[in-house]
């Protein structure tokens, strides 16, 4: 049983799309988490000073010291916009994953074209999500004071990169020399 170039590209594209989907879940979870456990594992920004750890997402921030934690809601002006972009990033990453999987099992040029469009929109929403956060003056001031980006932010940026790779693979699969055909069986 052999695979043609189009199927191999489709399988790799599916892998990157799956990773982008998982990372979009982590980014969204870190942004909307409202407890120290959720923010510790997927915060968008964290800081440590004098035995006190601080974790923040879009909607909540938590401080932890000596086994005690205190969380409060952020009054950040951009939290609704960032939450909307994060949710749309998640939805478009999911739609992209489904379209790539469908394309792999039922090759169709129209599905490939729609998949490229959905992937591009997912990239735009992901870029807007981490761009709004990184461009905020309060975040910049915190970073200057010693805070660092957390795993939620990193997941969002990496999701963008993986969607970009999946988009490039999707466009390559549309080229005439990469036409996907059925898997051929042995004689």
Stretches with model-predicted labels:
Residues 2-34, 78-136, 153-180:
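Signature of small four-pass
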Residues 34-48, 145-161:
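Individual transmembrane alpha-helices with interfacial aromatic-anchor signatures
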Residues 180-187:
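Non-transmembrane, juxtamembrane loop and terminal tail segments
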Residues 24-83:
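A surface-exposed beta-alpha-beta supersecondary segment
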Residues 2-5, 66-82, 138-151:
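Membrane-interface extramembranous regions at the lipid-water interface
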């Amino acid at each position: 049983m052999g695979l043609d170039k189009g199927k191999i590209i489709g399988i790799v594209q599916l892998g990157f799309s799956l990773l982008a989907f998982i990372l979009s879940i982590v980014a969204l979870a870190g942004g909307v988490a409202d407890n120290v456990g959720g923010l510790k594992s997927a915060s968008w920004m964290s800081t440590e000073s004098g035995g006190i750890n601080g974790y923040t997402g879009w909607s909540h921030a938590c401080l932890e010291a000596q086994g005690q934690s205190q969380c409060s809601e952020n009054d950040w002006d951009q939290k609704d916009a960032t939450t909307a972009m994060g949710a749309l990033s998640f939805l478009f990453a999911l739609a992209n994953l489904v379209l790539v999987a469908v394309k792999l099992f039922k090759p169709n040029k129209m599905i490939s074209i729609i998949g490229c469009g959905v992937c591009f929109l997912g990239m735009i929403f992901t870029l807007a999500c981490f761009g709004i956060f990184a461009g905020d003056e309060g975040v910049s001031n915190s970073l200057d004071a010693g805070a660092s980006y957390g795993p939620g932010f990193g997941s969002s940026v990496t999701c963008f990169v993986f969607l970009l790779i999946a988009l490039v693979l999707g466009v390559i699969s549309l080229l005439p020399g990469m036409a996907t055909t059925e898997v051929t069986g042995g004689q």
